[in-house]
Amino acid sequence: MATAKSNSSTPDIEFQPGISTPLGRLLKPLNSEAGKVLPGWGTTVLMGVFMALFAVFLVILLEIYNSSVILDGVTMSWESLGK
């Protein structure tokens, strides 16, 4: 018959959502734009700026850890923490 369903490898199971949780309801608006791609660069530039700022932050932490940055009055020893 032309109207009969064919036996495919995927069964016809209706999607039944799981338990609706408060966290799921809170996060649902964040996923509402999923799959929609705007033309152009979008927020790529903003992401690049934040990545650069984060890299600068990490470099500052590394310089403090390696004592490359001289901080007057700050000792870098575990004994000073116990006092």
UniProtKB/Swiss-Prot annotation:
Q: Where in the cell is it found?
A: Plastid, Chloroplast thylakoid membrane
One Gene Ontology term of the biological-process aspect is:
protein stabilization
One cellular component (GO) term of this entry = chloroplast thylakoid membrane
- Per its record, what are the GO molecular function terms? phosphate ion binding
| Self-association state and partner proteins as the record states | PSII is composed of 1 copy each of membrane proteins PsbA, PsbB, PsbC, PsbD, PsbE, PsbF, PsbH, PsbI, PsbJ, PsbK, PsbL, PsbM, PsbT, PsbX, PsbY, PsbZ, Psb30/Ycf12, at least 3 peripheral proteins of the oxygen-evolving complex and a large number of cofactors. It forms dimeric complexes.
Give the family, as the similarity comment puts it: Belongs to the PsbH family.
Q: What is this protein called?
A: Photosystem II reaction center protein H
User: What is the protein's species of origin?
Assistant: Stigeoclonium helveticum
Taxonomic lineage is: Eukaryota, Viridiplantae, Chlorophyta, core chlorophytes, Chlorophyceae
List the gene name.
psbH
